[in-house]
């Protein structure tokens, strides 16, 4: 692949991912309008912040500027979403505990553990990459309960088709990017992201929506951080 095509792929992947991250802004806008988070969970925001923070660390270690850029933006956005959720949730104490746990994990792994391997750069990259994959794969598990509901109901109207299609394209872009730079830690989670998106898209064929609403997912839960 030519340098121009490579730059085009990395640039479009970053732009697509940022637009995907911005889906959380629509959720937060509703919180602000209603002055309440209702019964929605703040966990996706916290997980998004954790995932982007890990990938930011990984990008810095591997000196991949595209990874660094997209995750600086992602971690900033998810931190803002987290703060907005905190302002409007009634269960602040539980939410603070969840966020404190995530910060503890982030500090323990990124700051303490990996810095002990400062003289073993390859091992530090490997360990950070493993944590990135684990967090991202766990984030992929968020929509699975809805998929089971769709299968039981034999109706895909609760799935947001445009967002799923976008997720597939974003995962595919990063998968190709990971293949080009021979990075299995980028390839693996995005390969799984492609599979999950294709599974969801196939449900529209197997179980056609009786009346499409596309509101079954909270948008941010589908915006898998990378």
Swiss-Prot record:
Q: Which UniProt keywords apply?
A: Cell membrane, Golgi apparatus, Membrane, Repeat, Sugar transport, Transmembrane, Transmembrane helix, Transport
Instruction: Share an example GO biological-process annotation for this protein.
Output: salivary gland development
Q: Which domain of life is it from?
A: Eukaryota
Q: Which GO terms describe its cellular component?
A: Golgi membrane; plasma membrane
Q: Does the keyword ATP-binding apply?
A: no
Q: What is its main location?
A: Golgi
Q: Name one GO molecular function term.
A: sugar transmembrane transporter activity
MtN3/slv domain segment(s): 8-92, 129-210
Q: Does the keyword Oxidoreductase apply?
A: no
- Which residue ranges does UniProt annotate as crossing the membrane? 8-28, 42-62, 67-87, 94-114, 127-147, 161-181, 185-205
Q: Where does it reside?
A: Golgi apparatus membrane; Cell membrane
Q: How does it sit in the membrane?
A: Multi-pass membrane protein
What does this gene product do?
Answer: Mediates both low-affinity uptake and efflux of sugar across the membrane.
**Entry's family note:** Belongs to the SWEET sugar transporter family.
Protein name (Swiss-Prot/TrEMBL): Sugar transporter SWEET1
Q: Which organism is it from?
A: Drosophila pseudoobscura pseudoobscura
GN (gene name):
slv
